[in-house]
A protein has these predicted regions:
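Structural helix-boundary/capping segments
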Residues: 35, 113, 164-169, 173-271, ...
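Short helix-loop capping/hinge segments that flank enzyme active sites or metal/cofactor-binding pockets
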Residues: 71-91, 253-262, 315-386, 437-453
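Short alpha-helical scaffolding segments that buttress acidic/His motifs in well-ordered protein cores
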Residues: 25-29, 308-309, 355-363
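Short glycine/serine-rich loop/turn segments
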Residues: 72-213, 264-266, 315, 401-419
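An N-terminal boundary/leader segment
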Residues: 1-52, 289-291, 482-490
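Conserved acidic residues
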Residues: 41, 168, 397-399
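Serine-dependent amide/ester hydrolase catalytic core
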Residues: 12-13, 301-302, 325-433, 483-489
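Residue-level signal for inorganic ion chemistry
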Residues: 29, 51, 104, 223, ...
Length: 490
């Protein structure tokens, strides 16, 4: 049996039917890590010994009825900004190189209760600030489809691990597209849920009003099943929502007849790569052939989305990252004169360039002379963007957009021009500004064989519309193929 061809749900079903053991799946994943990790570098840390022990424990639990869920026994990787008790959590930053949390994030407790097996921690852009996983203090992650290209970011390690077969499932976090964009680059499926659906307790904060944890998987059904496990109210997170509609899997059918899709015309203007546009338009054609209605409309606030997002996100980041000062935990500069000098040198040496850039931008827009001109204006703009999305959802079930204007850039290209990297988030940031759910599904490849993803955006609490549409499209599209199949490009 080729375990690499199985989805997470299929693997769990084979385990339940006693065709394979939990340990078989875990061993398979570690075999893939051993074979590919030197090239891909998706992980910052792996827990082989603990995972093998956990596999035996879960196997016993499945047999005695303790673990009955649809993903029991499945290996999963965790982005390294999500706390696991007793395991280093670095956020891919030098300043947290030795930070070991004394508690689990809420999502970790839920995964363990559901019988999943945690494989390790994945690489990311430092403090989730970046779109390429190149700002990590611990080296770049490479795209499994072509090792000369980036996997996207900031959840690039999680998406690359799934694409390379180094895990079946992964958790990422999404602040401005950090699950959806790397999912597109790596040819996997990823969803950013409605804000407040998944507890942020134990997620190291970047921008608290925008951050949300979400699943990455091989297909839509895997992501729906994983979201059912991690979603739900948590009293430890003041922004956590009480929701009754957390059965996502039942919404998935092969039919989308009568669904109305909206496409913002501004999302197809200059800057969109022709090959990405062609794949996107072909997807619209497929949806129409399936009986859906696709209409174009104007989203006038599009040009304000990037500036509003980067002002708000950087402002919140500058506040959140004040806690990393070398006093209680993490890196501390070795040589300093007095307390203030220790703060200064610790943060100068501990933070990377991109993080410092965003802290400075955030501090600037929050400063007394510029607060009204920038931060307050950005908040008002955010409200106008949300109003326009509300108007769109009064007419459309789902909005469609490319996940990124281009396919995965070559390593090093994006770091030369940070502004261009920021502009690459044009199609994803509004989802976070408005607290909406969004899913990325592979829809094509460019001439070089790099994946292209389509993004489906839903109204708040309407993930079921996304799962229905994405699953139906996925069935029509057929098999997308696998990265590193028959040897990788290098």
């Amino acid at each position: 049996m080729d375990l690499g061809k199985l989805t997470a749900l299929q693997l769990a079903e084979k385990i339940k039917q006693h065709q394979i053991s939990v340990l078989d799946g875990v061993k398979y994943v570690f075999d893939q890590i051993e074979a590919k990790e030197d090239k891909v570098h998706a992980y910052l840390d792996t827990y082989k010994k603990e995972a093998y022990a956990r596999a035996k424990e879960v196997q016993k639990g499945i047999e005695d009825g303790t673990y009955t869920g649809p993903l029991a026994g499945v290996p999963i990787a965790i982005k390294d900004n999500i706390c696991i008790k007793g395991k280093t959590t670095t956020c891919a930053s030098k300043i947290l190189e030795n930070f070991v949390p004394q508690y689990n994030a809420e999502v970790i407790d839920r995964l363990e209760e559901a019988g999943l097996v945690i494989i390790g921690k994945t690489n990311m852009d430092e403090f989730a600030m970046g779109s390429t996983t190149e700002t990590s203090a611990y080296g770049v992650t490479r795209n499994p489809w072509d090792l000369e290209h980036v996997p996207g970011g900031s959840s690039g390690g999680s998406c690359a691990a799934v694409a390379a077969g180094e895990t079946y499932l992964a958790l990422g976090s999404d602040t401005g597209g950090s699950i959806r964009q790397p999912s597109s680059y790596c040819g996997v499926t990823g969803i950013k849920p409605t804000y407040g659906t998944v507890s942020r307790y134990g997620l190291v904060a970047y921008a608290s009003s925008l951050d949300q944890i979400g699943p990455v998987g091989k297909d839509v059904a895997d992501c729906a099943a994983l979201l059912e496990i991690i979603a739900g109210h948590d009293a430890k997170d003041s922004t956590s929502m009480k929701r009754e509609d957390l059965d996502f899997s039942s919404s998935m059918t092969d039919k989308i007849v009568g669904m109305i899709f909206g496409v913002p015309k501004e999302y197809l203007s200059e800057g969109l790569n022709p090959e990405v546009k062609e794949a996107f338009m072909n997807t619209l054609k497929s949806l129409t052939e399936m009986g859906a209605v696709v209409e174009f409309f104007s989203m006038k606030t599009t040009e304000y989305m990037i500036p509003a997002y980067y002002i708000i996100a950087s402002a919140e980041a500058s506040s959140n990252l004040e806690r990393f000062d070398g006093v209680k935990y993490g890196f501390r500069a070795k040589e300093y004169e007095g307390l203030h000098d220790m703060y200064k040198k610790t943060r100068t040496e501990g933070f990377g360039e991109e993080v410092k850039r965003r802290i400075m931008l955030g501090s600037f827009v929050l400063s007394s002379g510029y607060y009204d001109a920038y931060y307050l204006k950005a908040l008002r703009t955010k409200a106008l963007i949300k109003k326009e999305f509300d108007q769109a959802f009064s007419k459309y079930d789902v909005l469609l957009a490319p996940a990124s204007p281009f396919t995965a850039p070559k390593l090093g290209e994006s770091l030369k021009d940070p502004l261009a990297m920021y502009l690459g988030d044009i199609y994803t940031v509004a989802v976070n500004l408005c607290g909406l759910p969004g899913i990325t599904v592979p829809c094509g490849k460019d001439a070089a064989g790099l994946p292209i993803g389509i993004q489906m955006i839903g109204d708040c609490f309407k993930e079921n519309n996304l799962f229905r549409a994405a699953h139906a499209y996925e069935k029509k599209r057929g098999d997308f193929g696998t990265a590193m199949e028959g040897g990788e490009k290098a």
